[in-house]
Amino acid sequence: MNNHIEALSYYLGAFVDELTRLNVCDVVISPGSRSTPIALLMEQHEGMKTYLHVDERSAGFFALGIAKAKKRPVALLCTSGTAAANYYPAVCEAFHSRVPLIVLTADRPHELRDVGAPQAMNQFNLYGTFVKQFTEMALPEASEAMYHYARMTTQRTIASALLAPQGPVHLNFPVREPLIPDFSLESLWDKGRGEYTGVVQQGNVTMPSEYVDSLVGRLSHMEKGLIICGDGSHPEITEVVMKVAEKTGYPILADPLSNLRSGNHDKTMVIDCYDTFLRNELLKETWKPNVLIRFGGMPVSKALTQFIKKQTKAVHIVVDESGQWRDPALVATEVVQASDSEFCRALLEKMPVMKKNDWFGMWKHINEKTRETLREMETYETAFEGKVITDIVRVLPEGATLFASNSMPIRDTDSFFFTSDKNIQVMANRGVNGIDGIISTALGASIICDPLVLVIGDLSFYHDLNGLLAAKLHELNITIVVVNNDGGGIFSFLPQYEKKEHFESLFGTPIGLDYEHVVKMYGGSFSRVNGWENFREEVQTGTKTNGLHVVEICTNREENLKLHRELWAKTMDVITTSLQGESK
């Protein structure tokens, strides 16, 4: 037998087998030549589920979506050259949103590097600081030591991806020709396999009792506190953070991505309309918390971020399992390295029930006044983008997922996704907040989250049209609501809007595309709705039937801006009147 083929087969077979032993059982493969042996072995292994995606940029985000939904590592495989470079945006998003991706790039052997060989470029540390670990794998070799090396390297790599903060890792595989493994070899998957699988077991960081005692002592004298839950708050936090809020009397400002706004849990302490009422100047000047405790990433709301920045005399506690200093407001006074649930449990063990005061009641009252005013838009006949969110939530079934694209959809979700007893998961790409790869991420998530509705603007939809291929290839079920305002709607809300002379060409960027034919090219159904009743019917139909369904609702940027501003202005008047009445 050819010694090279034997080495290639056993060495890479050990690697693929070890991935599955470590519960990395999903791989997104971008077709190519140099990655042939790994791709074939993955397809052959009974423990591996493979997904083909021919566009590497979309493939990267597709894998990201699977990993986000499954909450476990997913592998991503491509050939050498620019194929690997096209994974870069998804790797950046995975790094900043703390999603474990196992990026596998095939490469030319060392003798073909830097000599002008075709499809060869420097892939060493290709993703720079956006991966937690880079490993240049050794060339295949037929020896027990190298089979063991393949498995041990896999174990270390997966451990790195899973340890807090979770994130992407990169393995680069130089491979010589010929590239076809020999599947007739005996015990193809067993080489280097020991009795045990070595992997770092995850556990909670225990909080020092001295710190807990000190914190409890301080909090007991701080009646005006806030609990802020952002994207990435651990699902286990729901019950315990509610108990902490009840004991302290601190309102919970829950970002939609915290998934605390919906479900059958007690939401008495949850505040959902802060993004609107924190725009009120009188409220911002008179409501001064003395402690803020934050879990997860910084919330979507700019109004909340600005409010936090102004609380310069308050104690700001950021809880982060990795201990990383995630504080874009630059006000953190303490960063506590602990899991969200561990921090809450430690407080609950020693925290007395604090004396009731008016603090929580103030927040609850203004929140209810704000929600009541905002809900007036539910009577609008005009195509208002905020109503897109409320009407989708209205028809979504129990257990559904709402994926909000970046730009306006996530902001409208923040403003108009009100608390609900229906269990609806909200997802988004808020690592680096780009508009690229949104369709692909949502499609990846739809493998696990069914039904899933994606809300996306027309520019973001255009940006990732190639991603629709995955729906056809893998027979995925998804409903995509395209809010088509013919351009970048968010810029109408920003200072750039005042530069009328160049606004449309540089920021409004109307592209005037009709998406019906491209959706049908990918085997999907397309409907352009006429009125809100028709909109709700189409969304509901999409969630109940298989396949790709695209529902387009056309809005006018100018009208949408006007309606947002009118609604905010009316809400500000209601809040100011309420605050002035309380002060008399």
From Swiss-Prot:
Biological process according to GO: menaquinone biosynthetic process
Keyword hit for Zinc: no
Cofactor note: Binds 1 thiamine pyrophosphate per subunit.
Top enzyme class: transferase
Keyword field: Magnesium, Manganese, Menaquinone biosynthesis, Metal-binding, Thiamine pyrophosphate, Transferase
PANTHER family: 2-SUCCINYL-5-ENOLPYRUVYL-6-HYDROXY-3-CYCLOHEXENE-1-CARBOXYLATE SYNTHASE (PTHR42916), PROTEIN PHYLLO, CHLOROPLASTIC (PTHR42916:SF1)
NCBIfam families membership: menD
Summary of subunit composition and partner proteins: Homodimer.
Protein's name in the database: 2-succinyl-5-enolpyruvyl-6-hydroxy-3-cyclohexene-1-carboxylate synthase
Species of the source: Bacillus mycoides (strain KBAB4) (Bacillus weihenstephanensis)
Gene: menD
